[in-house]
Amino acid sequence: MKMNSKQPRKQRKFLYNAPLHVRQKMMSAPLSKELREKYKVRNLPVRVGDKVRIMRGDFKGYEGKVVEVDLKRYRIYVEGVTLRKVNGTEVFYPIHPSNVMIIELNLDDEKRKKIIERRAG
């Protein structure tokens, strides 16, 4: 499904109705300078197990592993970034992937290694 429209309403519609394989690509975050030099890639989709640094918002400066990627809500959940509810339980704070920087990649998946090699050129 190719997106050619500049109309904000159609851009929003595409975002809301995007299939999961397209949403995964939209969940990209920039890599740190060290990783960028090492892998020759500027950004990658965030995955569970990646270590990220939060760059914007109330939790700016926090670092932790990604524990969940929520494709439905376009949010990620980071270890150690929690809020306490009134009843005392801890809940993860949802963060948009554009507000984080990947500082360590989870390379357990062979397919991901191949994706990085392919994108590096």
From Swiss-Prot:
Gene3D superfamilies: 2.30.30.30. The keyword NAD does not apply. PROSITE patterns: RIBOSOMAL_L24 (PS01108). One of its GO terms (biological process) is translation. Keywords: Ribonucleoprotein, Ribosomal protein, RNA-binding, rRNA-binding. It holds the Pfam family KOW. GO terms for cellular component: large ribosomal subunit. The keyword Cell cycle does not apply. GO terms for molecular function: rRNA binding; structural constituent of ribosome. Belongs to the universal ribosomal protein uL24 family. Part of the 50S ribosomal subunit. HAMAP family: Ribosomal_uL24_A. One of two assembly initiator proteins, it binds directly to the 5'-end of the 23S rRNA, where it nucleates assembly of the 50S subunit. This is Large ribosomal subunit protein uL24. It comes from Pyrococcus horikoshii (strain ATCC 700860 / DSM 12428 / JCM 9974 / NBRC 100139 / OT-3). The lineage of its organism: Archaea, Methanobacteriati, Methanobacteriota, Thermococci, Thermococcales.
